[in-house]
Design a protein with these regions (language model features):
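Single conserved hydrophobic/aromatic residue that forms the stacking wall/gate
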Residues: 1-9, 13
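Secondary-structure boundary elements
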Residues: 11-49
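Second-shell loop/turn segments in exported
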Residues: 14-20, 55-62, 163-167, 177-179
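Cysteine-centered nucleophilic/redox motifs
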Residues: 52, 61-92, 185
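Hydrophobic/aromatic-rich core segments of domains that either
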Residues: 93-127
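Solvent-exposed coil/turn segments that connect beta secondary-structure elements
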Residues: 108-112, 126, 133, 153, ...
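Proteins synthesized as precursors that undergo proteolytic processing into mature forms
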Residues: 149-203
Length: 222
């Protein structure tokens, strides 16, 4: 499941981003990890309460997707039938291009400062959301610490992935699924994606291989 709740387990890393020469101690991480539990959220109508005073609710993982979906709904309410919303990592297309063709959306090559895409996809009226370890990270003694954390350990997720891209109808869903699939790893992520209707994934591994769950969107490296 996707946990929106976080404690200072993630805040510890965020604070350390100011001083990239320091890694939180294991004792710090384990202490804060005790407060990571989505069951601490109580919802009553429009009221949301946390039963753990040391827990924090972090919606950063879905905020851009939520905003993108609202922007698309607004444009459609104004009878705009063609357009593209780009919030950086979240691309949401409205209908198809004015000439009737699909949009070409690039997926960034991890750690490439030039911004060149590693591949492109062809979509219309779809969301394309990417989560990757190259977005926010720092290195200490040659070791990379990224922002996607394993909620069972408190440390950055360890696997062979650099990024996960989700193609779906909803950008908010894409936000949640891209992070979740990254944490799950390729095999379990594929199982999840295959269980969902209208959702596909593109995985970029740490040797820059591209793995897809479908050929539907004409993934191209040219």
């Amino acid at each position: 499941s996707t946990h929106c709740i976080s404690s200072a387990a993630s805040d510890v890393y965020k604070r350390q981003e100011v001083d990239a020469s320091v890694v939180p101690s294991d004792a710090q991480i384990q202490s804060e990890l005790a407060h990571v539990n989505y069951r601490n959220i109580q919802i009553n109508g429009n009221d949301v309460m946390l039963t753990d005073s040391k827990a924090k609710l972090d919606l950063g993982g879905i905020a851009k997707g939520f905003i993108a979906d609202k922007m698309k709904a607004y444009l459609q309410s104004k009878k705009i039938s063609s357009g593209i919303i780009n919030l950086g990592g979240n691309v949401l297309t409205v209908g198809e291009k004015s000439d009737g063709s699909d949009y070409t959306v690039g997926i960034q090559k991890p750690f490439d400062e030039s911004g060149e895409p590693i591949c492109t996809v062809k979509v219309k009226d779809k969301s394309v959301v990417t989560s990757g370890i190259y977005e926010r990270y720092y290195r200490v003694d040659g070791k990379l610490y990224h922002h996607i954390l394993d909620t069972t350990t408190g440390y950055p997720v360890k696997n062979n992935l650099y990024s996960v891209t989700i193609i779906s109808d909803s950008s908010c869903d894409g936000d949640a699924l891209s992070t979740t699939c990254f944490a799950l790893g390729i095999d379990k992520a594929k199982e999840l994606i295959n269980s969902l209707s209208g959702v596909e994934a593109i995985f970029v591994t740490n040797d820059y291989s591209i793995i897809t769950t479908s050929d539907e969107y004409n993934v191209s490296t040219e």
